[in-house]
Design a protein with these regions (language model features):
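Secreted, disulfide-rich extracellular signaling modules
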Residues: 1-165
Length: 165
């Protein structure tokens, strides 16, 4: 079976995590220019109002995929499998052996942004700075729901497999 690879055309990490002062949420932060996509949830906070969450936004070239189906490069009808390959970046923090990543199709367009700061979350998108964040999908245009709106019928959950190379 032939394999066809598609790379994301844009990406961003958005979060509602607390900033270093532990009083302010980083809901305006943007990490669109970072070369790392950070997925986290603070242990023990998953069901509380103080939960700190992150979401990774990825956009793939859907028009290219559609064109490849029409051209017969990939099957024009029936099932086609898509796999998302991720890697663990080296860092000093301890990771759980196993955690679940949920993949959902975002239902609204969004801007990538130019933020880099994943520690103190100081790169914020505002009316004059493009990019998505926890509350806005672009500059000053809000998501339908904080944290991004997605198609609930397009949902996949999968376990990560540790890759310690």
């Amino acid at each position: 079976m032939a394999i066809k690879k598609y790379k994301a055309t844009k990406d961003n990490t958005i979060t509602n995590a607390f900033k270093l002062d532990l009083n302010t949420r980083a809901t305006g932060s943007n990490m669109g220019a970072s070369d790392i996509l950070e997925v986290f949830s603070i242990y023990g906070q998953q069901t509380t109002s103080s939960a700190e969450l992150s979401r990774v936004l990825l956009e793939f070239p859907i028009s290219n995929i559609s064109s490849d189906r029409t051209a017969g490069t990939i099957p024009a009808s029936g099932s086609v499998n898509f796999y998302l390959r991720v890697h663990n970046a080296r860092h000093s923090e301890q990771l759980p052996n196993n955690f679940t990543v949920n993949v959902m199709a975002v239902s609204q367009s969004w801007q990538e942004g130019i933020g880099l700061d994943m520690e103190s979350y100081e790169d914020e998108t505002k009316e004059s700075i493009e990019g998505s964040n926890w509350t806005n999908r672009e500059k000053a245009t809000a998501w339908a729901k904080a944290g991004g709106e997605y198609h609930s019928s397009s949902y996949v959950a999968g376990k990560t497999m540790p890759n310690y190379t």
